[in-house]
């Protein structure tokens, strides 16, 4: 249970959370280009009592608290990147009830809440039951391919006992399993030519369209409790209206929360590409994203972690958690056999759109949940 001092701290520091959100929203951070946000977070952590802070090669801001060479570790993480490619500040506005900006909830508000929550324990130099890593991580979105989370698991590996990531828009939702995915950039090349003089030559756009049509004939595997999907998200190519296209490309993906179904999709996609090669079409396939499904996590330990989140939601909000699968930074530890969940410390809507927003009156509740989960690892 949160102490009176913790509740007072939350009430007194909501404006700090809002200030961090405003500051971060003014700093563009597409995946792989989070340098400026990372520097902001590093400076903030150091100015607020965190002594062991660094930016690693993956652009993660890693704050180590009472970490020794041997003790077990628990990770608390929220990502700095946004799904948007913009390299100039995006529009931001707020009123008494909401803030509006691309990326304001996913994951800026979650990150701000995590930062201020962690500060409570660190500034008071409270004794931890294990080593703690507070991480503002890179590359969660899109073709970031979970680079930041991968680096943390690579660097700390089997020492990590449990792993939390803050992401999402619903304080009751607990992501309990991983949705894996494979993402491809597929490029088709043909002879092309002048639209009149070379009429009859193969058109790369037509060939790519035919591949897409074949993909969309796929009947996804059916399995109880499993959802499998596919999507073509971007297509581009051609030269001009009077040119038979020599080159066209697409970005496509498939997803599933089941490893066997993910493998079924892989085989179908690869057979499709090979079939068009057999027809004399040049098809280049580049794997640009590989997010694993869950691995062999000790079920009892994962259940205990989920139960801890369920208990916090019940205690704070008098409600039951909503469990489900998703693709988050938790994919990587789960694939490595580490108990991991994703929870939200903010409430909003419109994620991945330019109309994204957060509810300001829910920031205290997000901070309560975040601090309640962290509290378990301190001797209070």
Would you name each region that the model predicts?
Residues 1-35, 348-352:
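N-terminal capping segment at the start of a domain
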Residues 108-179, 253:
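Acidic/histidine-rich catalytic neighborhood of metal-dependent amide-processing enzymes
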């Amino acid at each position: 249970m949160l102490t009176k001092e913790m509740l007072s701290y939350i009430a007194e520091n909501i404006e700090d959370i809002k200030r961090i959100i405003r500051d971060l929203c003014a700093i563009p951070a597409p995946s792989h280009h989070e340098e400026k946000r990372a520097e902001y977070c590093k400076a903030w952590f150091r100015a607020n009592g965190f002594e062991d802070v660094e930016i690693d090669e993956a652009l993660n801001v890693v704050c180590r608290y009472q970490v020794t060479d041997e003790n077990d570790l628990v990770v608390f993480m929220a990502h700095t990147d946004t799904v948007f490619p913009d390299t100039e500040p995006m529009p931001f506005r707020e009123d008494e009830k909401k803030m509006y900006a691309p990326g304001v909830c996913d994951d800026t508000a979650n990150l701000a809440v995590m930062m201020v929550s962690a500060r409570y324990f660190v500034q008071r130099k409270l004794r931890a039951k294990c080593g703690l890593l507070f991480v503002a991580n890179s590359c969660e979105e899109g073709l970031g391919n979970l680079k930041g989370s991968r680096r943390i698991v690579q660097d700390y590996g089997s020492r990590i006992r449990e792993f939390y990531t803050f992401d999402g828009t619903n304080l009751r939702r607990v992501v309990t399993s991983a949705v894996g995915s494979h993402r491809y950039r597929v490029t088709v090349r043909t002879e092309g030519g002048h639209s009149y003089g070379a009429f009859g030559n193969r058109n790369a756009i037509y060939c790519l369209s035919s591949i897409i049509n074949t993909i969309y004939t796929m009947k996804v595997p059916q399995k109880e409790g499993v959802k499998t999907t596919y999507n073509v998200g971007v297509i581009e190519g051609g030269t001009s209206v009077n040119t038979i296209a020599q080159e066209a490309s697409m970005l496509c993906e498939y997803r599933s929360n089941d490893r066997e179904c993910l493998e079924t999709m892989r085989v179908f996609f690869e057979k499709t590409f090979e079939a068009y090669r057999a027809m004399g079409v040049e098809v280049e396939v580049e794997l640009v994203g590989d997010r694993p499904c869950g691995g062999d996590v000790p079920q009892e330990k994962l259940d205990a972690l989920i139960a801890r989140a369920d208990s916090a939601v019940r205690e704070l909000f008098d409600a039951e958690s909503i469990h489900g699968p998703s693709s988050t930074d938790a994919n990587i530890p789960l694939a490595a056999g580490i108990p991991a969940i994703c929870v939200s410390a903010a409430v909003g809507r419109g994620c991945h759109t330019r109309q994204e927003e957060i509810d300001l009156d829910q920031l205290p509740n997000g901070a309560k949940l975040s601090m309640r989960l962290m509290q378990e690892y301190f001797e209070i």
